[in-house]
UniProtKB/Swiss-Prot annotation:
It comes from Drosophila melanogaster. Residues 292-311, 323-422 are annotated as: Disordered. Residues 383-399 have a biased composition (Basic and acidic residues). One of its GO terms (molecular function) is zinc ion binding. The keyword Metal-binding applies. Pfam families: zf-HC5HC2H. Required for survival of imaginal disk cells possibly by regulation of cell apoptosis. Required for germline stem cell self-renewal through mediation of BMP signaling. Keywords: Metal-binding, Zinc, Zinc-finger. One of its GO terms (cellular component) is nucleus. This is Pineapple eye protein. The gene is pie. One of its GO terms (biological process) is compound eye development.
Length: 582
């Protein structure tokens, strides 16, 4: 009991221990939850098999639901950790608060919950509520039921012949398992109807079938002929001379005279039979051979785990694909699941800004015209048209001046910092590039050092100027930038944000993830890393230091499909291609 007092459910935050109303404690990898909190949590899907996570509930999903429950307040106690939601009024509450306030739980299908006001009612229930019967007796504990109320008693919907305490019925159902029958009419439909009355029925053998020496009588030799028609004149127990009694070679619980077997099976007298199998064992062997293959592996091999696999039941819904993503930090490890994946070290782009993009420039043509048309209103989209045919532009006489230099060297050219910051132009602007300078001119060169400005830049010019410099020096120069780092820039992390939760001794770092583990691939989402406050790797929380943090698989807390700014960049590229630009 002292160990149970130290336990706290990760979902509901309560430490109550009652197997009948909260279910057994499920403990895996220091994760402790009530089993009924797993089943009845409205937004927690069961995406694994009986050997995955905790009876089909993946550890990642459990921690994700626990983190989401910390944002929900209970309708009754006004505390966080509410994971159950009324299927009709959508009010949230704890499992414990629901039990105390007469909520109804369905332990089948989608495992729905209902508050007291929204509980399902039919004509029979309304009749019991308006005119409750008197002098009822519980057939399990043989105690009187002082008042028949639906939240404290159950009844057999198959026959409606009596009532029983809900607590007694929970113990009876937990003990009986497959063998649960209606205690009034012995109907098998009772198992399905009782699950709608807040009673959990496990799909397993009865507990008395698993007790020590439960089948002791099967190991005792029963030297008595069990054939329907015993032919021995001295009786069924006679075991001498030619009337030898043989035991079943499988169970040893059934025996028969050899002569009785020969007569019953119509075997030839010359054939001497030394063993036989009773009809019950033959039927069991036949069903095992025809049934599906079963595995004898344990659910959890770790000795520290505490999970009873016999409690496994299947839960339908909610659909995991439609669940809302959350940025709340949760564990991401997944236990023996088809959906689990290896943790990959994330590499980053060389840009410190997450919005940076590389532009691949096509080989220069003889004449390249870049036109940016008028835009009536500010827009983050940019139209660029490449025309390979020369077009005349207005210019003054430049017979005595050298050829025009590269656009990036013109001192008065505006240089916006982002695609969304391109100002409205009063007229169409064209850049005429001299083919003699194509081998020496670099347009829109993006340095390979971190830039705090934009994803890309465009140099604009409306006319040419006299340039006294020699033509050999007309080479585009990159803007001033810090010296290149010595390490490979692809090893840097692409940061999104960093934060701390009040009351938690942890620091959370959100980074972007890319396909194939490199920033050259497509962004696939974000990853939340969790570090302790005293971790020496995050003592320096500057951007440059966080980009160079060496992460391990244990640092991964959760993942999300939110791609942030990369989602907008991809939409811009799709629009750009849809307009016919290349």
């Amino acid at each position: 009991m002292e160990d149970n007092k130290e336990l706290q459910c990760l979902i509901c935050k309560y430490s109550d221990t009652d197997d009948l109303v909260f279910g057994e404690w499920m403990i895996v990898r220091n994760l402790q939850v009530h089993y009924f909190c797993l089943l009845l949590s409205t937004h927690l899907p069961q995406r694994g098999g009986d050997s995955s996570g905790i009876l089909g509930f993946l550890l990642r999903d459990i921690r994700e639901e626990a983190a989401a429950a910390e944002k929900r307040k209970c309708w009754y106690c006004n505390k966080i950790g509410a994971s159950l939601q009324c299927d009709r009024c959508r009010s949230l509450f704890h499992l414990k608060c629901g039990l105390e306030n007469r909520a109804v739980f369905e332990f089948c299908g989608q495992y729905k919950s209902y508050c007291y006001k929204c509980r399902p009612m039919d004509d029979y229930k309304r009749q019991l509520q308006s005119n409750p019967p008197r002098n009822a007796t519980c057939p399990i504990c043989f105690s009187s039921i002082y008042k028949v109320e639906l939240h404290c008693v159950v009844y057999g919907d198959c026959c409606r012949l009596g009532f029983a305490h809900k607590k007694c019925m929970r113990q009876y159902a937990l003990t009986s398992g497959y063998y649960l029958r209606c205690i009034w009419c012995r109907s098998e439909r009772f198992r399905d109807s009782i699950r709608l009355q807040s009673v959990f029925v496990p799909d397993r053998d009865a507990t008395w079938e698993k007790q020590r020496n439960a089948y002791r009588e099967l190991h005792e030799r029963n030297l008595k002929c069990d054939q329907p028609n015993c032919l021995c004149p001295s009786g069924r127990t006679y075991n001498r001379l030619s009337w030898v009694i043989l035991c079943c070679s499988s169970c040893a619980a059934t025996s028969a005279h050899l002569k009785c077997l020969v007569g019953a099976l119509r075997l030839p007298k010359k054939r001497e039979r030394t063993d036989f199998k009773c009809s019950m064992c033959l039927d069991v062997e036949r069903r095992i051979a025809e049934g599906p293959a079963r595995t004898t592996e344990e659910t959890n091999a770790d000795g520290d785990n505490q999970v009873d696999g016999s409690f496994y039941v299947q839960k339908l819904g909610p659909d995991a694909a439609t669940r809302s993503l959350t940025q709340t930090p949760v564990f991401s490890e997944e236990d023996e699941s088809e959906r689990s994946s290896n943790i990959t070290v994330i590499f980053s782009q060389p840009k410190s800004n997450a919005t940076s993009e590389r532009l691949s420039l096509s080989p220069p043509q003889e004449e390249m015209i870049v036109e940016i048309p008028d835009s009536p209103e500010a827009s983050p989209k940019t139209s660029i048209d490449e025309n390979h045919s020369p077009q005349p532009i207005a210019r003054r006489d430049t017979s005595d001046s050298p050829q025009p230099i590269a656009a990036s060297e013109i001192p008065d050219s505006p240089q916006p910092t982002a695609a969304s910051e391109i100002p409205d132009l009063p007229q169409t602007t064209a850049i005429n590039v001299n083919p003699e300078l194509t081998q020496q001119t670099a347009l829109n060169t993006i340095p390979h050092s971190p830039q705090p400005e934009a994803s890309f830049s465009t140099q604009l010019v409306s006319q040419t100027f006299d340039c006294p410099q020699p033509q050999e020096q007309a080479v585009a120069k990159a803007p001033n930038s810090p010296s290149l780092p010595k390490e490979d820039p692809n090893t840097l992390l692409v940061l999104k944000s960093g934060f701390q939760c009040p009351g938690e001794p942890f620091f959370y770092l959100v980074i972007y993830e890319f396909e194939h583990g490199t920033c050259m691939g497509e962004c696939i989402g974000t990853c939340v890393l969790r570090f302790k406050e005293d971790d020496p790797r995050i003592q320096d929380t500057s951007q440059a230091a966080l980009e160079r943090v060496n992460i391990t698989p244990d640092d991964v807390w959760c993942r999300s499909e939110d791609r942030g700014i990369f989602e907008h960049i991809e939409k811009f590229h799709e629009w750009y291609r849809s307009e016919g630009f290349s």
